[in-house]
């Protein structure tokens, strides 16, 4: 609603208070169908929420407090308990994970938005549009920085602010190209070349990381190579699927079979479900490394590097995402590098 303020002020100045309030009420009225539609969609994807009228408010109260047993994650090279993440968690990760060209254009868009608020040559409608985009992109982050809830798994809980960021950045680029057209037309090709290079930079990183694009860190962070020891990368353990496929292929190639009367035992350090699904019913998955045949470890801070033969190694951009070790005949007490929470 804050985004409507410039338009409301302009209406009061030109139409009078009564007409301005009437027009504002009409805007709220035409938004009601959208709220109803949103409520129905919420019911489809979250049936519990509409079983009783008070359920959404009950959920709001429940989830406003961290209800899990706290654990630690890597942030800026230090292990930090997730309820105690510093206010800088989100701005740091957004600055290090978003493409450089998006950050530059977004900064220009935010500055331009606030500068336009005091300009009389910019229409109230335009001010409202850009202020709403700016608030949609920044207000949730500011609230999180002030309230400091439990934060973990990077920026995934705040990806909803990226679309308005992208729209604001795109509008900033369009305004810049239009300004060059009217003032320095010969610079337009150079600006377009810089923009194209800015798009190709993250694209090349995504190609190198595929299918683990969600672990992307930009060149400000030094890509995933620079971020590897400072932040968590594959927190969902997606690389365990490829590691599992590699283990199966390796065993087939070696023509090895499990001991008579039992399945292969694999101790997994990381989310076990990806490995369990990928390996299938011929393998037993667990944490116990002492009785396991193989150890599958995620390339994160909480998993040990073992002194055992490496059967499979998943790497991207010289960073190890996962490994499978042959630990038959070895006494491996634990796969964890730190105590379990």
Where are these regions (language model features)?
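Hydrophobic alpha-helix feature that most strongly marks membrane-spanning transmembrane helices
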Residues: 96, 115, 147, 165, ...
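Transmembrane-lumen/periplasm boundary regions of multi-pass, lipid-linked membrane glycan transferases
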Residues: 3-151, 197-245, 323, 340
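Catalytic lumenal/periplasmic loop and adjoining terminal transmembrane helix
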Residues: 46-51, 56-66, 149-151, 186-332
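Conserved, well-structured beta-alpha core segment at the onset of a catalytic domain
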Residues: 20-21, 144-147, 155-159, 167, ...
């Amino acid at each position: 609603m804050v985004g409507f303020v410039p338009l409301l002020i302009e209406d009061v100045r030109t139409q009078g208070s009564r007409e301005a309030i009437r027009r504002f009420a009409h805007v709220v009225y035409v938004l009601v169908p959208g709220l109803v539609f949103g409520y129905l969609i919420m019911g489809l994807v979250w049936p519990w929420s509409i079983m009783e009228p008070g359920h959404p408010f009950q959920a709001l109260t429940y989830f406003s407090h961290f209800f899990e047993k706290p654990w630690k994650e890597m942030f800026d090279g230090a292990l930090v308990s997730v309820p105690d993440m510093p206010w800088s968690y989100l701005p740091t990760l957004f600055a290090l994970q978003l493409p450089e060209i998006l950050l530059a254009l977004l900064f220009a868009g935010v500055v331009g938005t606030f500068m336009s608020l005091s300009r009389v040559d910019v229409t109230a409608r335009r001010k409202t549009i850009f202020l709403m985009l700016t608030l949609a992109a920044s207000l949730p982050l500011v609230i999180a920085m002030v309230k400091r809830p439990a934060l973990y798994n990077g920026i995934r809980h705040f990806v909803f602010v990226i679309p308005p960021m992208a729209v604001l950045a795109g509008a900033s680029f369009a305004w810049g190209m239009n300004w060059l057209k009217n003032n320095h037309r010969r610079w337009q090709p150079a600006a377009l070349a810089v923009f194209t290079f800015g798009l190709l930079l993250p694209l090349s990183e995504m190609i190198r990381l595929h299918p683990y694009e969600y672990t992307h860190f930009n060149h400000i962070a030094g890509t995933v190579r620079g971020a590897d020891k400072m932040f968590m990368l594959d927190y969902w353990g997606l690389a365990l699927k490829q590691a599992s496929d590699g283990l199966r292929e390796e065993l087939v190639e070696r023509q090895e079979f499990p001991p008579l009367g039992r399945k292969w035992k694999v101790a997994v350090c990381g989310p076990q479900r990806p490995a369990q699904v990928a390996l299938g019913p011929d393998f037993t998955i667990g944490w116990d490394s002492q009785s396991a045949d193989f150890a599958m470890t995620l390339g994160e801070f909480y998993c040990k590097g073992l002194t055992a033969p490496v059967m499979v190694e998943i790497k991207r951009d010289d960073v190890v995402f996962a490994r499978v070790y042959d630990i038959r005949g070895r006494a491996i007490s634990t796969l964890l590098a730190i105590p379990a929470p």
